[in-house]
Amino acid sequence: MDFAKIVQDNINLRPHQIEAKAEIFDAWSKYDSVMLQMPTGTGKTYLFTSLINDLVCNYKREHKEINILVVAHRTELLDQISATLSRFGIAHGFIQGAREQHLWKRVQVGSIMSLLTEKNYYNVCRQRFDYIIVDEAHHSLADTYVKLFNLFPEAKKLGVTATPWRLNHESFLSLYQHLITSPQISWFINKGLLSDFDYVSIKPNSEVQRLVNNSEVASTGDFSNTDLDNTFNKQRIRAKVYESYEKFAKGRQGIIYAINKRHAANLAELYSSHGVDAVAIDCDTPKEVRHDLISSFKEGRIKVLVNVDIFTEGFDCPSVSFIQLARPTKSLALYIQQVGRGLRVVEGKEKTIIIDNVGLYNYFGLPDANRMWMYHFKGHEDVVHKDNSRLFSNECEFVAEVDESRFRENDDSSWCSGNIC
């Protein structure tokens, strides 16, 4: 395929998507494997589906056959990809779990966990995929993805992610030869393509911040969940989490990120005891129950979803107007993915409130800080991008605004009374 001559259908794409797609085709003329970085909520799935549509149409025009595989690691992502392919009228099959397979279809949507099982391995190898697209590609250094890439050395590959960053600072260059970066989050906010936000956090010298800083680190490189549970899943700290919600986000619909199932259940119970329609959800929540809870949330019948590692990727609900961070992490990728759930735009939403009860700002800066993604892509150590000064009140929190003044102080700091803030 001569990518320089490919006919692109850019109807319904925004300028940044059109530019990114052109850069992908140009990069494929020089490299076999490229990665695209684009912030959460700016249309990655729609973009690569448009690219798939271009490929399918151009191959048909030239009377050639084509096989495309789109890979993800979660059911929610696979369903989202399938729905977008259907919007484009692209016939596709599934390679996932017990789903019925239609391997004769030229586009396949596959779970990385299912593709290389003994049941599917032979059929996958027979497909001879010409293109492989990986969603949430910051996971693709895992052995399963490496094995998949090695099965199809001649295929063109595209990995898409908001965060080309690994907790161990591993380089992506072993899989991807080139990184295409999109504008920064601040650019999308200024263009009205992502939501403006206020950010509330604890002071760097607060007791909670000291507890976070002194928490045990697990072999994964992130904080130990057991230690976090022992330290932060206490009534007085949970009470401060609720008080901050009541002060800054009461009546809003949003998502809370908790440490583990017990922490999530305790927080949901606390919020419910104050009359807030809150439920806990985690990976062990039955699929049917999870679907019903998410539907109720999207329809507005549930105000607060307290989750454990569920709504970090592939969850699309633009009406979310507050995000509450109650789970410490050392992962920049997790931080950006979590706050990104609240930055989608929808009519009537002026700003998102981000309540940071565990001081992630003090590790990573604001969500829209300028990130040197090429630096992280190559595997260099972290740089905290705090390119704006901070203003604190005399108590324990600050509120950051995305506007010309950039920050404002908050004089009322009742939620920081006592030793924990």
What positions do the PLM features span?
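Conserved pre-motif I regulatory segment
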Residues: 1-37
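Conserved helicase ATPase core of P-loop NTP-dependent helicases/translocases
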Residues: 79, 94-104, 120, 265-269, ...
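Conserved interdomain linker/interface between the two RecA-like ATPase lobes of SF2 helicase motors
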Residues: 179-257
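Conserved RecA-like P-loop NTPase helicase motor core
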Residues: 283-290, 294-371
